Amino acid sequence: QYGTISDSYREIKLLALFLNDFGEDMASLRSEIPTIRILPGDMHTVRTACRHDADHGYVFFNNYQRRWKMDDHPQVKLEGLLDGKASVGFPAFDLKEGMYGFFPYNMKLNDAVLHTALATPLCVLHTKKGDAFVFYGDLDPQIQWEGDARAELCLISRQEALNAWKVHLDQDYLVLSENYVWEENGELVVTGSGKTMIAVYPAVEKGIVDFKECGKRGNFTLYERIYKAQEPEAELVCKEQDKEKAVYELKLAYPGEKNYHDAFAFLTWYGNRMEVFDGEEKINDYFYTGQEALLSLGYFEFPEKLKLVVYPLHPGDPIFLEKQPDAADGCACKIEKLHVETIFR
């Protein structure tokens, strides 16, 4: 909402980056699933499958089931299938509960052939020094090549991959940032708070507008941007509370120059639902999920006063929640805390 990045978006971006550079190859391969039938209630057996031809492929593994505890599997050895040939063996690794993904085997990377890797391909960077192939994962990758040819690899963690953005300026770059990154008129644009740190590979030759180089982390160059701004002032007061609802008044002030793009109000609240009013107009509402409520002040032209109404959630209400809020007073119906964060670009 309001242009923020969800966890689902980050997961989809992982797949989109892979498919953009490697999807044509994967789509041409046939799928093969082991003939053993694994029932949905089986929490003990590792799920595997392959997409492959006679020369190369990808092995998929899954040890995750939502809301179920899966067994850990120490020293698992995956096998990549090939048409009419012996399977390709992977080095052993500990497959923990909750892990899932896929690994390549006999993967052609320009003139080199990557025999096996306990890491997942993300994208290709076409740089002035040649192609760099980005792989991610949290295991020791145990890279194994066929023959003497080698390709340039850039290895990152899965969390870094979730925060990865591929952009093209004078060449391709991989930018690691928790916020949005894109190219605009030949420049790198990065959203973020007053203090924003990014990691870039390879280093940007002409620098990045408003960012200063501040160090190295492996193959990546670190850049930092610091904007000084007077943060919006927020005061939240409970004006009314009864069995039906709790009514809050949120007063906002914006001292100094608004040199920021937006300001987000984050509300920790408990209840069934919450409504936000600007005067008599309802501008947003929320259903309780256990997460903070996010409200863009810039989207609503930086209002100075808002009314927030929280409706109670009672124990036993027919609403599914993975984690129930505290109902010490017989119900959950309150805003516990608020903070405001400015956003720059």
What are these regions (language model features)?
Residues 114, 222-250:
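Edge strands and adjacent loops of beta-rich recognition modules
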Residues 1-207, 343:
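Carbohydrate-binding surfaces of carbohydrate-active enzymes
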Residues 308-316:
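Short beta-strand-plus-loop segments that form exposed binding edges in beta-rich domains
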Residues 83, 146, 277-283:
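Short strand-turn-strand beta-turns centered on an Asx-Gly dipeptide
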Residues 317-345:
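Exposed low-complexity, polar/acidic, P/S/T/G-rich flexible segments that act as propeptides
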Residues 103, 250-252, 292-300:
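Exposed aromatic-hydrophobic patches
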Residues 284-292:
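A short acidic/small-residue loop/turn micro-motif
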Residues 256-279, 286:
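Aromatic-lined ligand-binding clefts that engage carbohydrates, nucleic acids, or primary amines
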